[in-house]
């Protein structure tokens, strides 16, 4: 647990990117949850009344929602990449500083290429974990909370 706390200490200057990334995932999730409601409305009102103008209007609104979901998804990717790779750069910098403190007798036990490979591979794995794992960790609770909220909004007697 102490190792996790120590690693988390390097995220300091990237907290803003992590928060903005989480916000973008929540907004994207909201747009994705609104589109099925719009489709139901399109069918219940537009198709049932044969109102072509209403169908085109709802279709356009759904297209805008889909584009906004795409944009927020791309912004999430940008923020998550900046946070994870910036964090990884700080970890590598700390690792290299620690290796520089080794005595010559300790350095003789390791090849230079072995040290570099170990440090870069481990940090790359952690970067990819943060970059790809942050989305589902944020998206799951967002879907749950927004889904429950929308279900109560659609049917308050529920």
Stretches with model-predicted labels:
Residues 91-92, 106-112:
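Transmembrane helix boundary and interhelical loop/hinge segments in multi-pass membrane proteins
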Residues 119:
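Conserved TIR/SEFIR loop-to-helix hotspot centered on a Trp-containing motif
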Residues 42-46:
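Helix-to-coil boundary motifs at intracellular loop junctions of multi-pass secondary transporters
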Residues 17-27, 41, 65, 71, ...:
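Transmembrane helices of ABC transporter permease
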Residues 1-32, 47-62, 72, 76-80, ...:
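Membrane-integrated ABC transporters
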């Amino acid at each position: 647990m102490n190792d996790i706390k120590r690693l988390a200490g390097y995220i300091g200057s990237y907290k803003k990117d992590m928060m903005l990334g989480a916000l973008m995932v929540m907004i994207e999730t909201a747009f994705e949850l609104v589109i099925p409601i719009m489709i139901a409305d399109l069918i219940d009102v537009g198709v049932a009344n044969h109102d072509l103008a209403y169908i085109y209007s709802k279709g356009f609104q759904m297209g805008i929602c889909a584009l906004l979901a795409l944009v927020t998804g791309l912004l999430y990717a940008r923020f998550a990449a900046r946070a994870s790779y910036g964090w990884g750069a700080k970890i590598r910098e700390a690792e290299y500083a620690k290796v520089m403190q080794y005595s010559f007798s300790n350095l003789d036990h390791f090849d230079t290429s072995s040290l570099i490979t170990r440090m870069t591979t481990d940090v790359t794995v952690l970067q990819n974990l943060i970059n790809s794992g942050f989305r589902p960790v944020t998206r799951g609770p967002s879907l749950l909370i927004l889904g429950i909220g929308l279900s109560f909004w659609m049917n308050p007697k529920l």
